[in-house]
Amino acid sequence: MFGGLMPAMVTPFDERGELDFEATEALVERFIQAGVSGISPLGSTGEATHLTFDERKRFAEEVVKLVAGRVPLVVGVGSSGTREAVELARHAEGAGADAVLAVSPFYWKVGEEALFNHFATVADAVEIPVLLYNLPMLTGIELSPALISRLAGERENIVGIKDTVTVYGHVVSVLQEIKEANPDFAVLCGWEDLVFPSLLAGADGSICAFANVAPELFVDLVNSTREGELQRAAELHRRVLELVTLGARSDPPIGAIKLAMGIQGVPISPAVRGPALPADEGAREDIEAILRDAGVLNPSKAR
């Protein structure tokens, strides 16, 4: 159920910084038309930590309605506290999400037993599938293959992981130590640079941020690799590596991603929530050049 390309969906805001559901609808339709295998809102790229609790619930409800069961919807429920993560997971299940994505707690640097209790408690609170989210570069905590294996072995509804790491060896370890024993456990790469090699090693797909900008490129990369068209996939991988350089044009990359989406003709404001900063308009030419070099700039829609 969980594989292929799933964009880590941005959260559109209007010029006043409020949730923009018209832009959200346009984005959902763009993803569906691009042939994505699922959508994952309210993660890091979705600025979930910059939203109020009520906004997170409202956005989840709206995206469930807009997707309308056409592709699996994996809603982020990450929180630094277990109780809040449980409430968000229960809400997502009640709203109609197909699964939830639970990131490591990200304030206290807790040990593996505390991490096990956190994820197990979230899994016990719902009946729908739970995907773990390993994001050590932001949380300061790396989920070890041993912990992942224990969670998957002791909780039937923990069915996969979004592994956002810069070290390829971690993905390989997860594949070797967990997926070989449990082929149904979904391994989804969250780091664009590693999508192609992860797929070659046996990963099921990707949940990634830059698919917001060029979903067709990432869908093509995943499908070409799966179908054994490796020469084509290698060229698509090169284009992905070019595309992700636009992330350096804002702090964090979300602002540059939203500006790039607007350049591509997506009706979305470049607005982000603090402490994130929007991309400077002076970066527009640089971003257009990157989109062109990556072979994804649509001149008829660029604005």
Model regions: which residues?
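Catalytic alpha/beta core domains of metabolic enzymes, predominantly
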Residues: D124-A125, M137-L241, L246-R249
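A general structural signal for well-ordered alpha-helical segments in protein cores
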Residues: T24, R56, A60, A85, ...
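C-terminal alpha-helical cap/extension of soluble enzyme domains
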Residues: M6-P12, A34-V36, T45, A203, ...
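Short, amphipathic alpha-helical "lid/cap" segments that border enzyme active or binding sites
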Residues: F21, E25-V28, P145, R284-L291
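Catalytic cores of TIM-barrel enzymes
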Residues: M1, N182-F185, M261
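Alpha-helical structural signal in soluble globular domains
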Residues: A34, R58, E62-V67, H91, ...
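Short secondary-structure transition/capping segments
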Residues: L51-D54, E87, E112-L115, L143-P145, ...
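Active-site beta->alpha loop and helix N-cap motifs at the rims of alpha/beta catalytic domains
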Residues: M1-P7, T11-E142
